[in-house]
Amino acid sequence: MELKWPKFISVVVDDMEKQRRFYRDILGFREAESSEQWVDFRLPGGYLELLKRDASPQRSSKRFQVGFTVDDIHAAREELMRRGVESISEIEGDEPGSKNLWCHFRDAEGNVFEITQWLKNPEG
């Protein structure tokens, strides 16, 4: 298993529209995709993702998370769990049209990180 350079950083926000305006209008980031729960801004080599705070274990108490790209998410998840890394979600994103699969873990101090396997080119 090889964890590759972070492809994204997620920032958990309480006021999505306020943060969206800040990153888009003040910092000049280009908005790529969005929903009511998240906004992606494309950056060279990756993206910044704003996530609306909710009751999920991944977002309830932390303000950010890092996502690492892997080639085979099933093998990577199995290996991380074998190494004693705490898994806090099953593999998600396995729906028709999905661009990626992902799952979440906690590091030694409880910080959340994600591993992602891209099914389609994340740039387009």
Which stretches of residues belong to each language-model region?
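Residue-level detector of conserved, well-ordered beta-strand and adjacent loop positions
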Residues: 42-44, 51, 106, 116
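Residue-level structural signal for beta-strand termini and adjacent loop
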Residues: 37, 53-54, 118
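Short, positively charged
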Residues: 19-21, 79-87
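Core segments of cupin and vicinal oxygen chelate
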Residues: 10-48
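N-terminal beta-strand motif that seeds the catalytic metal site of vicinal oxygen chelate
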Residues: 1-18, 47, 64-66, 119-124
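Vicinal oxygen chelate
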Residues: 2, 6-14, 39-42, 57-124, ...
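Short, surface-exposed beta-strand-loop junctions and turns on beta-sheet-rich folds
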Residues: 47, 56-57
